[in-house]
């Protein structure tokens, strides 16, 4: 991209890619307008037409919102095919409001290649999982799934729309999200939404 509007087109391309990764379907034109600070939907349509002409996106004429970022488009964004998204921050202490923004991308570990497209990473904040070897500042690799077996470590969304990393247990009439820290109490919930199962761990700095 070399024309004056190239940066804006890349911004739009990035927003489309991140939105699809986050919620599995593309944004509306008005959502794109808001995200990239454009007031005119016709301007966005023009940028989308140019992105399609360059081969960065594919559109389905029969489905107005069907937009797919192509491999060429991912290359323009610097995203390798085996990269996985790092999504916001999730607590491993007291739950915090879940953040669903994609911060960056991380190379997929070779032993998890079969899970490509179903994985995301979250940075852990807190010490509630230290007995399981998950420390403050670690990145957990999570397989997207909506259920888990008792004893598995999951990323769960509580009824207050907060995300947390805990060991999952389904009890009689309630759910228990158990920390791996002897000084902390479990979280007891009548309803819990599982975002995924922790399948790996990445630590950038080791003391």
Curated annotation (Swiss-Prot):
Pfam families: LexA_DNA_bind, Peptidase_S24
UniProt-listed InterPro entries: ArsR-like_HTH, LexA, LexA-like, LexA/Signal_pep-like_sf, LexA_DNA-bd_dom, LexA_repressor, Peptidase_S24_LexA, Peptidase_S24_S26A/B/C
Gene3D superfamilies in alphabetical order: Umud Fragment, subunit A, Winged helix-like DNA-binding domain superfamily/Winged helix DNA-binding domain
Record bears the keyword Hydrolase: yes
Site (Cleavage): 92-93
GO molecular function: DNA binding; serine-type endopeptidase activity
Binding region for DNA: 29-49
Keyword vocabulary terms for this entry: Autocatalytic cleavage, DNA damage, DNA repair, DNA replication, DNA-binding, Hydrolase, Repressor, SOS response, Transcription, Transcription regulation
Residues at the active site: 128 (for autocatalytic cleavage activity), 166 (for autocatalytic cleavage activity)
Catalyses which reaction(s): Hydrolysis of Ala-|-Gly bond in repressor LexA
EC number: 3.4.21.88
GO biological process, one term: DNA replication
HAMAP family for the chain: LexA (MF_00015)
NCBIfam families xref list: lexA
Physiological role: Represses a number of genes involved in the response to DNA damage (SOS response), including recA and lexA. In the presence of single-stranded DNA, RecA interacts with LexA causing an autocatalytic cleavage which disrupts the DNA-binding part of LexA, leading to derepression of the SOS regulon and eventually DNA repair.
Family: Belongs to the peptidase S24 family.
PANTHER family named in the record: LEXA REPRESSOR, LEXA REPRESSOR-RELATED
Subunit structure: Homodimer.
Name used for this protein in its record: LexA repressor
Organism: Lactobacillus johnsonii (strain CNCM I-12250 / La1 / NCC 533)
Species lineage: Bacteria, Bacillati, Bacillota, Bacilli, Lactobacillales
């Amino acid at each position: 991209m070399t024309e004056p509007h190239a940066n804006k087109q890349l911004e739009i391309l990035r927003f489309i890619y991140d939105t699809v990764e986050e919620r599995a379907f593309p944004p509306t034109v008005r959502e794109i307008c808001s995200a990239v600070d454009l007031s005119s939907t016709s301007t966005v349509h023009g940028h989308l037409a140019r992105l399609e002409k360059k081969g960065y996106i594919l559109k389905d004429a029969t489905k107005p919102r069907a937009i797919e970022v192509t491999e060429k488009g991912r290359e323009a964004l610097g995203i390798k095919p085996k990269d996985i998204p790092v999504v916001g921050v999730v607590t491993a202490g007291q739950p915090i409001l879940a953040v669903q923004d994609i911060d960056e991308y991380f190379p997929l570990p070779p032993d998890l290649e079969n899970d490509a497209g179903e994985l995301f990473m979250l940075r852990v904040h807190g010490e509630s999982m230290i007995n399981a070897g998950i420390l403050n500042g670690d990145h957990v690799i999570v397989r997207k799934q909506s259920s888990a077996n008792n004893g598995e470590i999951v990323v769960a969304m509580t009824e207050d729309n907060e995300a947390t990393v805990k060991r999952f247990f389904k009890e009689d009439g309630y759910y228990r999200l158990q920390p791996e820290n002897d000084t902390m109490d479990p979280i007891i919930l009548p309803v819990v939404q599982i975002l995924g199962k922790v399948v790996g761990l990445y630590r950038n700095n080791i003391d």
